[in-house]
Amino acid sequence: MAFSFDLAVILQRERRRTKRRRRDLCKSRQPIPEIPFDLVIEILTRLPAKSLMRFKSVSKLWSSLICSRNFTNRLLKLSSPPRLFMCLSSSDNSHLKTVLLSLSSPPDSDITMSSSVIDQDLTMPGMKGYQISHVFRGLMCLVKKSSAQIYNTTTRQLVVLPDIEESTILAEEHKSKKIMYHIGHDPVYDQYKVVCIVSRASDEVEEYTFLSEHWVLLLEGEGSRRWRKISCKYPPHVPLGQGLTLSGRMHYLAWVRVSDNRVLVIFDTHSEEFSMLQVPGDIFWKYNGLLEYGGKIAILNYTKVDIEGVMELWVVEDEEKNLWSSKILVVNPLQLQMVNSIISLTVLGTTRNGEVILVPGPEDKTVFNILLYDLQKNHIRKIEIKGGPDRYLNNIWEVVGMDDVENLMYL
């Protein structure tokens, strides 16, 4: 009994000592200094986008900060590792299935052969039946006939654009209709816009002319989700291939008349005005592509690469005077086989370091690979893409873009 009493006394004394120590500790403890908000912002900008998306749930303040335009723009200025985007398509019971995959681009190297492994599946259920046309600043455009969607590859947000209900050409039952969607950015008002060019051949067979309409939609802010028709003082035209955005302006090749030479159309995303440049007459429209060269818009003509091993680069030097410069590129004979082994090529643009991205056409289904052509070193390297589903090897696949931007903008 005495033992139990002594134990109770000891436990009671120990509890008192514990409470006293806690009380003394609380009195001596210094308050934790508050982290300056500017430092919080600096720390957040150094985190990957996936972490930022999770941290939105920390508090309303953090959510507002991460979703704010100033914070988003700050992230855009910080280059992320470039990523390649692949679109794989297969037809099952007349239904088109689309798979969107992503992989890190290979590092700079003089090695002729290397590989890169697919590490992300970005497919969303709403993408079924759509084809990816291009990617710009973390935003991807998906098209199915006259319908379009915008997909943020960082936030995984997929938005369906409204139909252009007021379009006369789209309302017509005409077989030769062509529709091109393109994402652009107005650097003055910091606005993202989607441009849509709708065109078709005219009914005047002897004239071989076209009809075209031009529409613009704001992706955010006042007036968003509504198409506006804009005027063009130049003749109606039909776009040839996808456009390229450079310095706040969209560029694309087009036909004005079937029998005429091609033109380079320039659309200023801020002023929403068009201009046209006559393309040099010996450029064949089917085997060329737009790219950036030294901060200028250029056309790479690869019509003769498989026969003579040469490409021709045309660079816009002066738009007002329609002045172009040209440069002949002779492919290294030891690397020519890499080009000749591909049935058809498409110019997809350039990497961050200026290498031209050459993508095999849909006829080449045996292996996933691309070519990177360094114009300065005259060096071609082949990048084999590994990790793709084998079931798509006998169907349509294509690399649809390269981008080095993580965009947290809410659509």
From Swiss-Prot:
Disulfide bonds: none annotated. Residues 29-75 form the F-box domain. It holds the Pfam family FBA_3. CDD domains: F-box_AtFBW1-like (cd22157). SUPFAM superfamilies: F-box domain. PROSITE patterns: FBOX (PS50181). InterPro entries: F-box-assoc_dom_typ3, F-box-assoc_interact_dom, F-box-like_dom_sf, F-box_dom. This is F-box protein At4g19940.
